[in-house]
Regions:
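C-terminal regulatory or interaction extensions
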Residues: 1-83
Length: 83
């Protein structure tokens, strides 16, 4: 089970990625520093679960990499958005 901080960050990331967004802009939008530790803790697991997709999946660190929510991510967002 996700702890509250991670769950809150997951929700925020899913909301912010409804359109393609660069990592720096994504982390700024959710008040996190654009640091590799935050990528590893919050973004990479969502990619691995298939909830977020990468514009350049063959290169995780592509200089123009952008992220967007996937259909399974949208379904999860709908589930966790309900009161």
């Amino acid at each position: 089970m996700l702890n509250k901080e991670v769950n809150s960050r997951v929700f925020d990331i899913l909301v912010v990625t409804t359109k393609w967004i660069k990592r720096e802009d994504l982390f700024n939008a959710i008040s996190l520093s654009n640091h590799s530790d935050n990528r590893k803790k919050y973004l990479d697991p969502l990619i691995d679960l298939g909830w977020i997709s990468m514009e350049y999946p063959e290169r995780r660190t592509h200089p123009n990499q952008k992220y967007k929510i996937t259909e399974p991510g949208i379904n999860l967002l709908k589930l966790i958005s309900k009161p």
